[in-house]
Structures are given as C-alpha cells and as structure tokens.
C-alpha cells in the first residue's frame, strides 16, 4: 500500500487483504477487499486489531450492485493493525480489510486525516503493497 502526498509516494506498507483478494467485493462474507475510490471517514481507537480507520465502503454504486444481485454488500471495512499477534502479513487473512503491522498503524493514524481519499486496486505484481 502506498501513502501518497502531492503525487509523491511518502510511505510504502506491506499489507494483508481479504482471504480472496482478487476481484471487487460484492457481498458480505466474500472475503474480498473492495476496489475503487472511497474515503477514510473515521478513526477507531478501540479496534480488536489494535487501531483502525474506516473505509467508506459500500458506496452508492456498491449498494446498487448488491441490490441488483439480491445480496447484502457488507461493510465495516477498515485499514487496521495486525492484532492478534498470530496473524501474519505474508498471507491474506482479513475478511476484506487491509491490515498492516501495529507499529505501522500507529504511524498511519498519525499521518492520515479523516476525510482522506483512498483508492484501492488490485495489481498482480504488487499484490501485497
């Protein structure tokens, strides 16, 4: 994951994604990380995964697609820490969130403000960046 300021990469984080990361999240329980443009819309200090920032999924288009398919789009997608400690970033293990280490999450929370846009996209060559 890249943290970009004024068009320049200022930080790079190794990440873990949903257990089935390739492809856009469509419904609750699909273990996919949503792809597209969202907003980091609030901070959660009491996360079970250390600390977290909420991603504004589902957006209007996500809700419309889920309705068309007759499914629940899910929600509560976060960028969060790596607690519990038995989870590792070498494998994708989340239920659709983006996980970084706890120390990196502390840094991320200090650097990133509520209201910051986030663009999530899958790339084969950088599947864990």
What residue spans do the PLM features occupy?
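Electropositive
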Residues: 10-39
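Exported/periplasmic cell-wall-interacting domains
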Residues: 37, 42-129
């Amino acid at each position: 994951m890249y943290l970009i300021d004024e068009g320049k990469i200022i930080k790079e984080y190794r990440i873990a994604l949903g257990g089935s990361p390739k492809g856009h999240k469509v419904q609750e329980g699909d273990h996919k990380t949503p792809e597209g443009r969202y907003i980091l819309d609030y901070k959660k200090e009491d996360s079970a995964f250390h600390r977290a920032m909420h991603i504004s999924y589902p957006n209007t288009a996500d809700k419309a697609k889920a309705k068309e398919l007759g499914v629940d789009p899910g929600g509560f997608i976060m960028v969060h820490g790596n607690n519990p400690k038995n989870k590792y970033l070498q494998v994708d293990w989340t239920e659709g969130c983006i996980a970084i280490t706890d120390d990196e999450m502390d840094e991320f929370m200090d650097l990133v403000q509520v209201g910051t846009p986030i663009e999530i996209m899958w790339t084969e060559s950088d599947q864990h960046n």
